[in-house]
Amino acid sequence: MSGNIGANPINNWNLLPLICLLSGCHFYRERFAERGFFYKVPDVLRDYLSAIPLEINEKARYKPGIANYHNIITCGFSTLLPYIRQQPLAMQQRFNLLFPDFVDHIQSPLPLASTLLERITFYAKKNRDELDKISCKWCCD
């Protein structure tokens, strides 16, 4: 089973919401650091983010907005679009059903290196139970 969701997303289908959450958090690393939000995220997310060096880049191509669940999921969903668009139409249509309604309008993909996606997928598999516990709770806080 490959770590790359683009190669075989059906093997990681149940992980896609968690992969979305982690990839969205990846893009929000700078924002978390700037606003002190880093210490408010659940431990399992903070552990993932702590393992990645952070360098504040004022000229970054993508500047995320306010760090909230809606924006983080929107960002993460956008990173998965290029991989999902490579799948048969039936799978593409089912993909949106894994997420809240607000993702339905998202069309613009955000680039995410395949090596980073593999790392995120591995982390999601390894920490699935812990991520499952916090993913719903965190969106309500």
From Swiss-Prot:
Pfam families found in the cross-reference section: OrgA_MxiK
Outcome of gene disruption: Loss of production of extracellular death factor.
InterPro entries on file: T3SS_OrgA/MxiK
Name of the featured protein: Putative uncharacterized protein YgeO
Source organism of this protein record: Escherichia coli (strain K12)
